[in-house]
């Protein structure tokens, strides 16, 4: 069987990521970040916005707004991108890195695994390995409890294993 290891994004601690994070938003919000544009995620985020009474921000590389009721963060710098996740109250995503940064910063996250281009197996695998059940299915997701103390301990263990593996590969003759 193939051995799996953490994505390098997850090998850097939240404290290290926080050092570069820059945020221009100073109030609680819901963040949308998509690898593939998805109306279903926008709809889910807008529904969550009504429930939680929070504004929605969407990281987007397009210069024009796409949906009414959403604030767009267009082409953020790396520091702003990281800051968007660090300061979000909730994250709605179908992206592996959206999932990873949500986990790094211990965010209330909701992830859509299935989309038009297939299944996001990297996000699915990461969340299942950590025992997080926050999949959006047919526009719905239960806000199950996430015990971040347990998950952070698991991440630390998995990170040590991954770093050891990388060190062994780099030091091979």
Segments the model singles out, each with a brief description of its role:
Residues 1-173:
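Active-site anion-handling motifs in enzyme catalytic cores
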């Amino acid at each position: 069987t193939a051995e799996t290891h953490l994505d390098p994004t997850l090998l850097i601690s939240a404290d290290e990521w926080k050092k570069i994070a820059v945020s221009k938003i100073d109030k609680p919000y819901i963040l949308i970040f998509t690898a593939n544009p998805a109306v279903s995620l926008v709809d889910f985020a807008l529904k969550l916005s009504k429930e939680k009474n929070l504004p929605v921000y969407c990281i987007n590389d397009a210069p024009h707004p796409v949906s009414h009721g959403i604030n767009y963060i267009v082409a953020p710098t790396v520091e702003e991108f990281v800051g968007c996740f660090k300061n979000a109250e909730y994250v709605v995503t179908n992206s592996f890195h959206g999932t990873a940064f949500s986990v790094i910063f211990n965010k209330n996250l909701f992830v859509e695994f299935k989309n038009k281009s297939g299944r996001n197996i990297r996000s699915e695998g990461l969340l299942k390995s950590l025992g997080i059940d926050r999949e959006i299915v047919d526009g719905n997701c239960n806000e199950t409890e996430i015990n971040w103390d347990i998950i952070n301990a698991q991440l630390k263990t998995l990170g040590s294993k991954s770093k050891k593996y990388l060190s062994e590969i780099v030091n091979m003759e």
